[in-house]
Amino acid sequence: MSDKDFLNWPFLEDQHRQLAVELEAWCEQTLEQLPLDHSDVDAECRLLVTELGKAGFTANAVPAAWGGNTEKVDVRRLCITRETLGRYSGLADFAFAMQALGSISLSLYGNETLREAYLPKVAAGEYIAAFALSEPDAGSDVAAMRTSARLEGDHYVLNGCKTWISNGGIADYYTVFARTGEGTGSKGISCFIVDADAHGF
């Protein structure tokens, strides 16, 4: 099987094949010209997200209602984007992947106010998203999570420790999972959007 044979798989459509062609051309014309020497990975990630946004590729990470390229987030488009970027630059692949991972919970389950506030900026490559799930004692065993969220008046106060935060330190907002206590195990976990400049963060 050649590097492109997978594009003929029956569950891919012409739009997916066209995406692969367009992204390949972008990688050759734009990505390879960017100043990526890994001397400042944080700045380079932001540059990559900005450039991917200008080209319309970060719009694959959110639904069309908030600036995305398709009605719903299409995992096939995400996979093709990551596979293509990964052949040219692992950092470009990572930068794109975290946009999708850090916003998918919001795309699927967020309220309209939050979706309107964050998703168009993710689609445009203007915001960097982060994903904060793992903890020192709760990595693959997510149900062992200890970070808590307590309702105080009209807002929640989160308390806990996260580790291995994808895009930690450079993100504009964080998708943070915390225990709200409605049930045992994973049934008592909720997702919060936390701005990078939030008090106490």
For each feature predicted by the language model, list its residue ranges:
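Hydrophobic, small-residue-rich alpha-helical packing segments that form membrane-like cores
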Residues: G139-D141, Y156
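Short secondary-structure junction/hinge motifs that connect adjacent elements
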Residues: E28-A55, G68-T70
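A short core secondary-structure module
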Residues: H155, N159-F201
